[in-house]
């Protein structure tokens, strides 16, 4: 016979008290008790992408995967997130498994390269062990791993060229993600995995594209971003940048499948002013008539490039437009109004 309700409640309270004593306060909690913290975020550098993510940026303490074709802007988006984390007083690390980080380009995007922790590991095991130790220190705000495809298992590096090492990298990723996920949640460290695309052989229906490193990352990631270059931006006949589209393929903290478009300028990164113009026109703060852009009677310029230059020189107007967009959409650097979603890893 089941115990009566008062006895059950008393037994549960005793069990919860013992759990708190053994494992720390908050180890088990009722979802409606109000002890949940709102989701803290790291802005991406593009207001359009922040809106598409639903909470104003990349969630802290979660796994993020950014993937796409070569030269699509994956590292650029990750470096902008690093710069924004540092701008808010955070500490960042970059695990450069590809040995391809350009410090000068990172500095142009706003990254404090003097304070950035950089590691160029020899093996995938070393890279992920370093990541685990940095997360467990509790001091890091963001860690970027560039890229999953370059996390080569030690056995493959030490073996002969042509040897078969089926599933080694997938097992390595699965084990590493099992280890770091809990530590990330406790420390609030965001880990961004940059990934490459491969094509599956013999696929007749559906997309043949897949990402490297097995399936574990797909499951553990709270946010997956598919980034593509859709257009080349030109100034006359000279290419000056790319129009980029990002699709939020997976999102555990807000509705998924939203898209964002923004400009990435060569040598400058994501154009903040370009994003503000696009969002301003979309939400009625900036008026576009023909090729002219106007804001509250002030002409910003003829053509998007001239309007972009105007906002770059007139930061007060730029900041005013940004503030209005963020107020209307309910996002910003202090976007913490959304209740924390359960970490369903």
Curated annotation (Swiss-Prot):
Q: Which molecular function GO terms apply here?
A: ATP binding; ATP hydrolysis activity; ATP-dependent DNA damage sensor activity; damaged DNA binding; single-stranded DNA binding
A Pfam family cross-referenced in the UniProt record is: RecA
Q: Which UniProt keywords apply?
A: ATP-binding, Cytoplasm, DNA damage, DNA recombination, DNA repair, DNA-binding, Nucleotide-binding, SOS response
According to its record, what are the GO cellular component terms? cytosol
InterPro entries for the chain: AAA+_ATPase, DNA_recomb/repair_RecA, DNA_recomb/repair_RecA_CS, P-loop_NTPase, RecA-like_C, RecA-like_N, RecA_ATP-bd, RecA_C_sf
This molecule's function is given as: Can catalyze the hydrolysis of ATP in the presence of single-stranded DNA, the ATP-dependent uptake of single-stranded DNA by duplex DNA, and the ATP-dependent hybridization of homologous single-stranded DNAs. It interacts with LexA causing its activation and leading to its autocatalytic cleavage.
State the protein's name: Protein RecA
What is the organism of origin for this protein?
Rhodococcus erythropolis (strain PR4 / NBRC 100887)
**Native organism taxonomy:** Bacteria, Bacillati, Actinomycetota, Actinomycetes, Mycobacteriales
């Amino acid at each position: 016979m089941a115990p009566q309700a008062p006895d059950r409640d008393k037994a549960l309270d005793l069990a919860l008290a013992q759990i708190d004593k053994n494992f720390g306060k908050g180890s088990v909690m009722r979802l409606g008790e109000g002890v949940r913290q709102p989701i803290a975020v790291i802005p991406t550098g593009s207001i359009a992408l922040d809106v598409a993510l639903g909470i104003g940026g990349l969630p802290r303490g979660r796994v993020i995967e950014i993937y796409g074709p070569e030269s699509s802007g994956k590292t650029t988006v990750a470096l902008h997130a690093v710069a924004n984390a540092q701008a808010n007083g955070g500490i960042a690390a970059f695990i450069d498994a590809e040995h391809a980080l350009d410090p000068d380009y990172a500095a142009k995007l706003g990254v404090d390269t003097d304070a950035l922790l950089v590691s160029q590991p020899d093996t995938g095991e070393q890279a992920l062990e370093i990541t685990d130790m940095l997360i467990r220190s509790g001091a890091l705000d963001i860690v970027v791993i560039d890229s999953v495809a370059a996390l080569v298992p030690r056995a493959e590096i030490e073996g002969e060229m042509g040897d078969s090492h089926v599933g080694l990298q997938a097992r390595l990723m699965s084990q590493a993600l099992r280890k770091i996920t809990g530590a990330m949640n406790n420390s609030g460290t965001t880990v961004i995995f940059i990934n490459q695309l491969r094509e599956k052989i013999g696929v007749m229906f559906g997309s043949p594209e897949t990402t490297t490193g097995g399936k574990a990352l797909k499951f553990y990631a709270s946010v997956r971003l598919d980034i593509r270059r859709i257009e080349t931006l030109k100034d006359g006949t000279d290419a000056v940048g790319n129009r980029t589209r990002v699709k939020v393929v997976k999102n555990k903290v807000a509705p998924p499948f939203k898209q964002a478009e923004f400009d990435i300028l060569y040598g400058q990164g994501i154009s903040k002013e370009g994003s503000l113009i696009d969002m301003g026109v979309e939400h009625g703060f900036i008026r576009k008539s023909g090729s002219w852009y106007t804001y509250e009677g002030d002409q910003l310029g003829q053509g998007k490039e001239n309007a972009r230059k105007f906002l770059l020189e007139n930061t007060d107007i730029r900041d005013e437009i940004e503030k209005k967009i963020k107020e209307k959409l309910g996002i910003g650097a202090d976007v913490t109004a959304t209740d924390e979603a359960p970490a369903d890893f």
